[in-house]
Amino acid sequence: MKLSILIPTYNQDCTQLVHDLLEQLPQDAEIIVADDGSTAASIRENNASIAKLPQCRYWQAKMNLGRAKIRNLLAEMAQGEWILFIDSDAQVKSKDFIANYLKETDGRQVICGGTGNYENCPSPDKALRYKYEVLAERKKPLKLRRRKPYAQFSTFNFMILRDLFMQIRFCNEICDYGHEDTLFGLALKDRKIPVLHIDNKLIHTGLEPTPAYLRKIKTSLFTLSRLDKKIQRRINISAIALFIKKCHLKGFATWLFNISSPRLKKNLLGSNPSLLLFKLYKLGFFCKIME
């Protein structure tokens, strides 16, 4: 089998995504959806119907395993030479999406398609996530993604040789949200494995309201704080925080964050949040929680 498309999902109905992929799925390919212990019964029921579709398999975890473990399990189930990871909150924008990947496989090992966004913010309460994602997309044109292939690596939409993935895998120690893609990108870099970036984007539909997004950001920063210091020095926000600590300014940074946090949050929760203040909020919070 040439290709296995792997879709991990948690409380996300991905039936439309699967149907859109089936319309362009080659005969020597499969789609596997793994539900990571979703708590919403209606979503579990809808996703379970995927098992009845041709060339599709569906698996449901009894409990939430986390973003890394569920992806590793999907790779173990896969029968394809290539595995294509797609997040369940993705939307297909091209009828040639799969073909665009397959025509790039000769001599390649890892291929990243990229992330796209809605043309307009879906609602004011999602302004922070939308503004951040759109700016990130604009700052990562194909030319830059190819110039810095590892720094721009994302697990949202990428394809990799299965045998290679099984040698690296996602870090099972990461159970909560955040940085499994960072670690995987660093692992590829350390092994000097070439990463090809192409313009084959999926639309990211999973934009959370700002309060929920800030909770996710805090979770990802807690995840980062538990990583080895050698890893932290290779990631921008933690590297800056470690420098602040080295300069004996951690206490001051924490104090400054504590007194400014209410005003920062007020801005971030508004309809026109400042991404500069968002950066300062993340840095201040990390300074506060790091050891």
Regions flagged by a language model, labelled:
Residues 10-25:
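Short, well-formed alpha-helical segments that are part of the catalytic scaffolds
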Residues 35-46, 90-91:
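A conserved acidic beta->alpha catalytic loop
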Residues 61-78:
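Glycine-rich, basic loop-to-helix element that forms the pyrophosphate-binding segment
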Residues 83:
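Short aromatic/hydrophobic "clamp" motif used to bind/position activated sugar donors
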Residues 95-127:
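Conserved donor NDP-sugar-binding/catalytic core segment of glycosyltransferases
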Residues 140-160:
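A recurrent flexible, glycine/aromatic-enriched loop bordering the glycosyltransferase active site
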Residues 176-184:
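Acidic donor-binding loop at a coil-to-helix junction in glycosyltransferase catalytic cores
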Residues 219-222, 237-291:
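Non-catalytic, C-terminal membrane-associated alpha-helical segments of glycosyltransferases
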